A protein has these predicted regions:
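Divalent-metal coordination cores built from histidine and acidic residues
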Residues: 124-127, 138
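Hinge/lid segment of periplasmic solute-binding proteins
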Residues: 131-146
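Twin-arginine (Tat) signal peptide motif
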Residues: 1-10
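Bacterial N-terminal signal peptides
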Residues: 9-18
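Sec/Tat signal peptide C-region and signal peptidase I cleavage site
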Residues: 5, 19-26
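N-terminal secretory/targeting leader peptides
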Residues: 11, 27-125, 143-377
Length: 377
């Protein structure tokens, strides 16, 4: 046997031992985990949640299985985390910032506006989470909330668009003159801090409010979810660059007692599948949003605009000011933000410069596509 074949054989054997059901796994008790989502099971986030579940099932030889339940199946949406804590359901699925009422630091994990005011995007936030102390702080978050939860960060679903408008906005003065639906909580409050007439309302209420003239503009998410909501029917001016939810993360909450009863192999399988889900989600959403945006522009006549540059400075500065206030009031919030600041001071100067070439390359290609004549029918 030559050296290359010997090395390949050893590598294959090691991989088999790492992931094949061993004696301990074969003897493990079967566990069924019910996951109640806070959103309908038709949502893209649930599609990727089911992929995560499938990966865990395959890695554990189906000794761990899942049932994904729609919002409200067992308890009301707002009670999801408490229900998992008490063991009424084994797991829940939402965005971390849903629970900022229990602890403001949840915002720094689920939806830090303007990347915590530090310029973090989805990729750099995941870098902080995996390699700069973020995961340990995430685990501590549940202890700070005093809930019996083991959390798994699964899905970076941002960046979200600034939003839609009935008429173009060319300056912050224009923006301040529009009644604009924003996310609830801290991101929406920061809009108010910079003078925007921010209105918080549920997703199902947005389109009727636009049709009745109650709103002049709105944000929800990104091209595909926005398309599903039908915003293109009443608004044609779309601004993709926004800061209120440039980083948005969805995660899984597992009851702590259920977690402790899993074997080490089963626990590792969940951790491996969760890490894989981070990249798979980014890849999936780039493709889905790209397809939706193409349809919005070519079929629905939606016009894309660049967000006024003054917006970025004003929103970022207001975010930092708000976060300094929370830091003064809450030691754990400060601990998390200080960790993100230390990471950003090192990583963001590199990452921001490196992304310029990607942005220029993408813009150049988009410009080429725009010059091509439309295909004949």
């Amino acid at each position: 046997m030559n050296r290359c074949r010997w090395v390949a054989g050893i590598s294959s054997l090691a991989l088999a031992f790492a992931f094949a059901p061993d004696a301990a796994l074969a003897q493990a008790k079967s566990v069924k985990i019910r996951i109640q989502s806070v959103i309908p099971t038709s949502a893209d986030e649930v599609t990727m949640l089911k992929e995560f579940a499938k990966d865990v099932e395959e890695l554990t030889d189906k000794s761990v299985t899942f049932e994904v339940l729609p919002a409200g199946a067992v308890v009301a949406v707002n009670d999801t985390l408490d229900a998992v804590d008490k063991g009424l359901i084994e797991a829940g699925f939402a965005w971390t910032h849903y629970w900022s009422g229990k602890h403001p630091a949840a915002t720094l994990f689920g939806s830090p506006p303007a990347g915590s005011g530090l310029g973090m995007d989805n990729f750099s936030w995941v870098s902080w989470y995996l390699y700069a102390g973020g995961k340990d702080l995430y685990d501590q978050l549940w202890k700070e909330m005093k809930v019996n939860i083991k959390g798994f960060m699964l899905q970076p679903v941002g960046p979200e668009a600034l939003g839609w408008f009935k008429k173009p906005i060319n300056s912050m003065a224009d923006f301040r003159g529009r009644r604009f639906r924003t996310p609830p909580g801290i991101p929406g409050q920061i809009y108010k801090d910079i003078g925007v007439a921010a209105v918080a309302m549920g997703g199902g209420d947005i389109l009727p409010a636009l049709e009745k003239g109650v709103l002049d503009g709105a944000e929800w998410c990104c091209p595909k979810p926005d398309q599903v909501y039908g915003f293109q029917r009443v608004m044609k001016h779309y601004y993709l660059q926004g800061l209120h939810q440039v980083v948005v993360n969805a995660d899984l909450y597992l009851n702590g007692d259920v977690w402790k009863k899993l074997t080490p192999h089963q626990q590792k399988a969940m951790e491996v599948a969760a890490n894989a889900s981070l990249m798979k989600t980014v890849a999936y959403r780039i493709h889905e949003n790209g397809k939706a945006l193409k349809e919005l522009v070519e079929k629905d006549g939606v016009q894309l605009h660049d967000t006024p540059q003054e917006y970025f400075k004003q929103y970022s500065e207001a975010t930092l000011k708000a976060f300094e206030k929370y830091s003064a009031e809450n030691p754990f919030f400060k601990k998390v933000l200080d960790s993100q600041k230390a990471f950003a001071a090192t990583a963001i100067p590199f990452w921001a410069q490196a992304q310029k070439s990607n942005a220029s390359l993408g813009a150049a290609y988009a410009a080429q596509l725009a010059k091509k004549p439309a295909a004949k029918k």
